[in-house]
From Swiss-Prot:
Its main location: cytoplasm. Belongs to the heat shock protein 90 family. The keyword ATP-binding applies. Molecular chaperone that promotes the maturation, structural maintenance and proper regulation of specific target proteins involved for instance in cell cycle control and signal transduction. Undergoes a functional cycle that is linked to its ATPase activity. This cycle probably induces conformational changes in the client proteins, thereby causing their activation. Interacts dynamically with various co-chaperones that modulate its substrate recognition, ATPase cycle and chaperone function. Required for piRNA biogenesis by facilitating loading of piRNAs into PIWI proteins. InterPro entries: HATPase_C_sf, Heat_shock_protein_90_CS, Hsp90_fam, Hsp90_N. One of its GO terms (molecular function) is unfolded protein binding. It comes from Drosophila pseudoobscura bogotana. PANTHER family: HEAT SHOCK PROTEIN 90 FAMILY MEMBER (PTHR11528). Residues 260-269 have a biased composition (Basic residues). Keywords: ATP-binding, Chaperone, Cytoplasm, Nucleotide-binding, Stress response. Residues 206-269 are annotated as: Disordered. This is Heat shock protein 83. The gene is Hsp83. It is found in: Cytoplasm. Residues 209-218, 225-245 have a biased composition (Basic and acidic residues).
Length: 269
């Protein structure tokens, strides 16, 4: 029987800060990704330092990297790192029940007109996720604990429970359920642009990943058949996202020398 989720109340100042982030208009919302990548970098630093004295700490996932994966179908943007990750108590304490010393100071600064982009300097950058998401899940696996998932749609509380989904090995996966008016952040080109702008400041590879596709010319009839095949396979497709270099699109409609109308479709490979 699956473990019941435990519900926790956000510490009062954190709840106030989240309300301020959610209910105030900020123009430079993209800073959320810089903050989450920065947190991923810190987690990678921690496991790297710890492994210097105990190399076995890296065994569960040796590669040190961060990836951002937009998924238009699910309406999510996922940020994954192979850093030190969080135990259950880390999730409870660090993401809601114990206010960082900068929480109140940052709220006061915001109300005095400070820019939202300063959030990281106060140690509460994680909550910037709620600039563009109305629900956030944080799945994490630390070497010293089982895998747990934290979840909150704000509203004053969050849940934590044991997670039996795909094992991370070690690290953290943050899934942002993007608000309906923020779907720009599901565009791979937009994510790549922000990652390129901010990831130059971290010492690890930060990739934007997507399902890889290529253009293939087919006749209209073949295109219909391909579409049916693709729909039949969609539920069974469990391939990992792949890094994609975006190239130029070719003309969508062409005719071959027999006069048949050609269509360019996307083919997974």
């Amino acid at each position: 029987m699956p473990e019941e989720a435990e519900t926790f109340a956000f510490q009062a100042e954190i709840a106030q800060l989240m309300s301020l982030i959610i209910n105030t208009f900020y123009s430079n919302k993209e800073i959320f990704l810089r903050e989450l990548i920065s947190n991923a970098s810190d987690a990678l630093d921690k496991i790297r330092y710890x492994s210097x004295t105990d190399p076995x700490k890296l065994x569960x996932x040796x590669x040190x990297x961060x990836x951002x994966i937009p998924n238009k179908t699910a309406g999510t943007l996922t940020i994954i790192d192979t850093g030190i990750x969080m135990t259950k108590s880390d999730l409870v304490n660090n993401l809601g029940t114990i206010a960082k010393s900068g929480t109140k100071a940052f709220m006061e600064a915001l109300q005095a007109g400070a820019d939202i982009s300063m959030i990281g300097q106060f140690g509460v950058g994680f909550y910037s996720a709620y600039l563009i998401a109305d629900r956030v899940t944080v799945t994490s696996k630390n070497n010293d604990d089982e895998q747990y998932v934290w979840e909150s749609s704000a509203g004053g509380s969050f849940t934590v429970k044991a997670d039996n989904s795909e094992p991370l090995g070690r690290g953290t996966k943050i899934x942002l359920y993007i608000k309906e008016d923020q779907t720009d952040y599901l565009e791979e080109s937009k994510i790549k642009e922000i990652v390129n702008k901010h990831s130059q400041f971290i010492g690890y590879p930060x990739k934007x990943x997507x399902e890889k596709e290529r253009x293939k010319e087919v006749s209209d009839d073949e295109a219909d058949d391909e579409k049916k095949d693709d729909e039949a396979k969609k539920d069974m497709d469990t391939d990992e996202p792949k890094i994609e270099d975006v190239g130029e699109d070719e003309d969508a409609d062409k005719k071959d020398k027999d006069g048949k109308k050609k269509k360019t479709i996307k083919e997974k490979y």
